[in-house]
UniProtKB/Swiss-Prot annotation:
Keyword Disulfide bond in annotation: no
Binding positions for a divalent metal cation per the UniProt entry: 241, 243, 275
Keyword Electron transport: no
Keywords, comma-separated and alphabetical: Isoprene biosynthesis, Lyase, Metal-binding, Multifunctional enzyme, Nucleotidyltransferase, Transferase
Chain residue ranges for the region called 2-C-methyl-D-erythritol 4-phosphate cytidylyltransferase: 1-234
Sequence segments annotated as region (2-C-methyl-D-erythritol 2,4-cyclodiphosphate synthase): 235-393
Source organism: Bradyrhizobium sp. (strain BTAi1 / ATCC BAA-1182)
Site (Positions MEP for the nucleophilic attack): 156, 213
CDD domains assigned to the protein according to its UniProt record, in alphabetical order: CDP-ME_synthetase (cd02516), MECDP_synthase (cd00554)
Protein name per its UniProtKB record: Bifunctional enzyme IspD/IspF
GO molecular-function terms, A-Z: 2-C-methyl-D-erythritol 2,4-cyclodiphosphate synthase activity; 2-C-methyl-D-erythritol 4-phosphate cytidylyltransferase activity; metal ion binding
Lineage: Bacteria, Pseudomonadati, Pseudomonadota, Alphaproteobacteria, Hyphomicrobiales
Binding-site residues, 4-CDP-2-C-methyl-D-erythritol 2-phosphate: 241-243, 267-268, 289-291, 365-368, 372, 375
Marked site: Transition state stabilizer: 19, 26, 267, 366
Named cofactor requirement(s): a divalent metal cation
Amino acid sequence: MTISQRTAAILVAAGRGLRAGTGGPKQYRAIGGRTVIHRALAAFSEHPDVAVVQPVVNPDDIDVFNAAVSGLRHEVPAHGGATRQASVLAGLEALVPHRPDIVLIHDAARPFVTSAVISRAIQAAGKTGAAIPVVPVTDTIKEVTASGDIIATPERAKLRIAQTPQTFKFEVILEAHRRAARDGLTEFTDDAAIAEWAGLTVATFEGDVANMKLTTPEDFVREEARLAAQLGDIRTGTGYDVHAFGEGDHVWLCGLRVPHSKGFLAHSDGDVGLHALVDAILGALADGDIGSHFPPSDMKWKGASSDQFLKYAIERVTARGGRVANLEVTMICERPKIGPLRDQMRARIAEISGVDISRIAVKATTSERLGFTGREEGIAATASATIRLPWSA
């Protein structure tokens, strides 16, 4: 049996994250252009040696969870409990039908876990049966009284900071959690503590200082700055598209169905705004153009909605570890009038792309009655896209 056939992971994501400030549960907040939970879940769902990924979420968050992790491999979420410990037990019980040998238990609030740490976790569990990732303590630690007076200075060389994923033989940690629940012990703060209480020896392995837990607003600010510093390859691409009018009673523009006296002559839905944006993004990536990715000769794209083209282009950026810094599109036409629809178009582009609306501009102009747009024979659009990539991409 291969490692990938017997290893499961639990992603604990049922907390409310109140200390992280406003904006909802911290696991659904964006950092570096992706939600925290998407980053954490992707690390496990994309790891070749993890066969089953079991999320545990608050039942009130099912819809937002599904939207945040769309496209990633995972099981149907288990419903979390009142404490982290209860949520982990729910995840373990959900894994029983899968009969894994090893389980990795990870906090969704640690979105920067690497494939290397996950691999070390799997190897450690196979050797010892129970192990956790740790990093050295670099500050001097003081033990204090309730009033704040120092009573001891622990020897720093013996101290370690515990991280996740904490990894165990599945049946062993399942039984330990069940025993703790039966005994009414509900306040363990991590799974290693439960294993210790159950009499298990818990080993350690090398963690990663970047695998930090996001807890406070300051954590988000610091990590946003760190991620931005890594994306030093700043690129800008441009795009252009045009479609002639034909029979019809509406046109698609920037993802909106706009009533009009004519329709577009086009292979897909003819959305010139989104097509220009897609070309701009692909140009910034030096990754061809919309025609090379979605050839008009392919009947698969006949009448296709252009929102899928924009999502695809954004995914190409994300796949290279990048993020979109700005999207701008200018519509060139006499009619329909773009001004009244500008904010709706920005909102729709934001919805499709996942880019914050503050980074999206929609503009409009005419050709002063000159040329085919002036004669109202069609609509043109120009676009630009600025993206940030790591230099290695």
